[in-house]
């Protein structure tokens, strides 16, 4: 079957590409390897506690057998189990001494259903970092190139947040921010008084606080502050492919969706320097088929897209499609997590907060920006969370009887956690390859993921732990516990970098518009395109790059240049 465009993957990147291409009048096929999911119908966000098995916990034996890796994600529960793959059915290879956690889900909408919804822009501190300190290659774009596209995707997605005027964290098109609670306001006041170059602000998140007519026309409503977001939101209050981009694409009449279709490889026509076809395997019947289009967007997620490229070998690309540079699969990055500190606060016992706010607070990067005293390059930011302990704290306390139960009716002490997100440097030996002898049940070679942190990440983590503990202590917190070892790569679920953008085809896979140097009608806009990781959550950047690349591709098609 022939289309104007094929988009592989329906998550945050694929959804945006499909929306933009369809809006430009292109007949677009969206290929999703997982099952079809119907927005609202297939969510458990309205399930009452007694309707969810085992008090929303997955039995330990089931976790160990089927979800050993997926269950390490904080969003994993009985009510969200449907959004994660069974590790037992979707294996991959990773060294025991250098483990990588590949956390994923196969279904329409992908991880746009379960993402953390934190939305921050990269700045020129990020886009110029590689060139300035010599780690990796230079980004082929700067902030000015992508800023209008940040504007575009923020307005459509709906981002709540507060403007702060920081060069390292550019402001955006914000809906009204959610409020900080009393403890966070006190912490903000103390941190900013002690450290004038540091800032505490509410987390910028993809939640509608005041829906616009465009949001309402798509059936989206305001956030109800229930904080069961990872189950899927029947109100459409947070941005996902299912609540926003795919409905918008479907309204054009130009979108065709195929689910349960696993991409086996991309065929290449050397004479035309083009992808000539997309071969897929039906996940249920294992029958094969092929689709053709004038342009192909690969948005299957970083590791899955890398797997497809490496599997698409040919006489002209013996090590994988678009891989003359030997870069495909290399420079895998994730954010440095498992860092920070936590503590309890003795005050504010007469204060509480309203609802279950779906975001925390944010303390943007300052080291090697406004405070140039790190013994490492790059930096980190903190995402913070605070609240009062509830009745369930009784499980860790000694007590029985009416008096004990009565005491638990009163909220407990305040606590706060500063969760660090640090930048990981791009290194060639952090790599995704195909296993030489093992394949999945559809005959596709398994990926082998070999990735570890280096000395720069370890020094960065030590500083983050120390700073977090010091800021909590200065603000009057007690029982402060700094974090220990860095979590294994993959735990941030921000994997990126394996088909990076760059100026030079000899050292990169993609040009400044996410177009493959070696294959004129192939574009890649998921996390694999990232040239460095920055310190902020990357999803908003994926959205902006996807919208930008899709419109550039549409322009090239209109002019006959591809």
Feature roles, as predicted:
Residues 1-130, 135, 140-151, 304, ...:
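N-terminal glycine-rich phosphate/pyrophosphate-binding loop and immediately adjacent elements
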Residues 23, 27, 34-53, 235, ...:
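Glycine-rich loop(s) and the adjacent beta-strand/alpha-helix scaffold that form part
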Residues 39-41, 160-172, 478-486, 559-562:
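Short, glycine/acidic-rich hinge or "gate" loops at secondary-structure transitions
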Residues 54-86, 90-101, 106-107, 115-121, ...:
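Conserved redox-cofactor binding core of oxidoreductases
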Residues 81-111, 115-116, 121, 139-140, ...:
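FAD cofactor-binding and catalytic pocket of flavoenzymes
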Residues 201-208, 226-229, 264-267, 411-424, ...:
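A glycine-rich dinucleotide-binding beta-alpha-beta segment and adjacent secondary-structure elements
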Residues 273-279, 415:
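Short, hydrophobic/aromatic-rich segments at coil-to-beta transitions
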Residues 532-550:
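A conserved FAD-binding loop/helix module that cradles the flavin
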């Amino acid at each position: 079957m022939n289309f104007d465009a094929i988009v592989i993957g329906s998550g945050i990147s694929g959804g945006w590409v499909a929306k933009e291409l369809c809006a430009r009048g292109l007949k677009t096929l969206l290929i999703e390897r997982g099952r079809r999911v119907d927005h609202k119908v297939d969510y458990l966000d309205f399930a009452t506690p007694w309707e969810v098995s085992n008090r929303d916990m997955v039995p330990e034996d089931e976790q160990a057998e089927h979800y050993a890796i997926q269950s390490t994600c904080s969003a994993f529960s009985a009510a969200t189990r449907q959004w994660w793959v069974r590790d037992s059915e979707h294996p991959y290879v990773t060294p025991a001494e250098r483990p990588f956690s590949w956390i994923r889900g196969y279904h329409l909408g992908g991880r746009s259903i379960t993402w953390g919804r934190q939305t921050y822009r990269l700045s020129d501190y990020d886009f110029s970092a590689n060139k300035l300190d010599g780690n990796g290659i230079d980004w082929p774009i700067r902030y000015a190139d992508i800023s209008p596209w940040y504007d575009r995707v923020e307005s459509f997605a709906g981002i709540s947040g507060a403007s702060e005027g920081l060069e390292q964290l550019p402001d955006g098109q914000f809906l009204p921010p959610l409020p900080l609670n009393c403890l966070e306001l006190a912490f903000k006041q103390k941190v900013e008084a002690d450290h004038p170059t540091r800032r505490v602000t509410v987390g910028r998140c993809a939640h509608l606080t005041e829906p616009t007519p465009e949001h309402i026309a798509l059936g989206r409503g305001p956030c109800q502050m229930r904080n069961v977001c990872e189950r899927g939101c029947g109100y459409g209050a947070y941005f996902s492919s299912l609540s926003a981009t795919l409905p918008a694409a479907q309204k054009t009449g130009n979108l065709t969706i195929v689910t349960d279709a696993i991409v086996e490889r991309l065929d290449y026509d050397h004479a035309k320097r083009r992808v000539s076809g997309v071969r897929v395997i039906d996940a249920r019947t294992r029958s094969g088929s092929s689709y053709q289009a004038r342009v192909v967007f690969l948005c299957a997620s970083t590791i899955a897209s890398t797997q497809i490229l490496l599997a698409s070998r040919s006489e002209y690309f013996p090590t994988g499609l678009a891989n003359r540079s030997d870069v495909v699969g290399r420079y895998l990055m994730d954010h440095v997590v498992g860092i920070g500190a936590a503590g309890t606060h003795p005050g504010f016992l007469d204060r509480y907060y309203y609802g279950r706010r779906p975001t925390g607070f944010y303390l943007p990067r300052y080291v090697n920006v406004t405070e140039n005293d790190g013994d490492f390059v790059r930096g980190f930011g903190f995402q913070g969370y605070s609240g009062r302990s509830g009745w369930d704290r009784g499980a860790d306390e000694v007590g029985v009887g009416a008096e004990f139960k009565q005491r638990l009716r009163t909220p407990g002490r305040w606590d706060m956690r500063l969760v660090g997100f640090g930048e990981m440097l791009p290194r060639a030996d952090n790599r995704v390859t195909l296993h030489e002898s093992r394949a999945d049940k559809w005959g596709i070679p398994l990926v082998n993921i070999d990735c570890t942190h280096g000395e720069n990440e370890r020094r960065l983590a030590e500083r983050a732990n120390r700073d977090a503990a010091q800021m909590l202590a200065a603000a009057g917190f007690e029982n402060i516990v700094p974090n220990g070892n860095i979590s294994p790569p993959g735990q941030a679920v921000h994997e990126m970098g394996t088909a990076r953008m760059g100026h030079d085809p000899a050292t990169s896979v993609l040009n400044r518009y996410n177009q493959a140097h070696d294959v004129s009608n192939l574009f890649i806009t998921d996390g694999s395109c990232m040239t460095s990781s920055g310190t902020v959550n990357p999803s908003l950047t994926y959205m902006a790059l996807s919208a930008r690349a899709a419109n550039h591709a549409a322009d090239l098609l209109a002019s006959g240049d591809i």
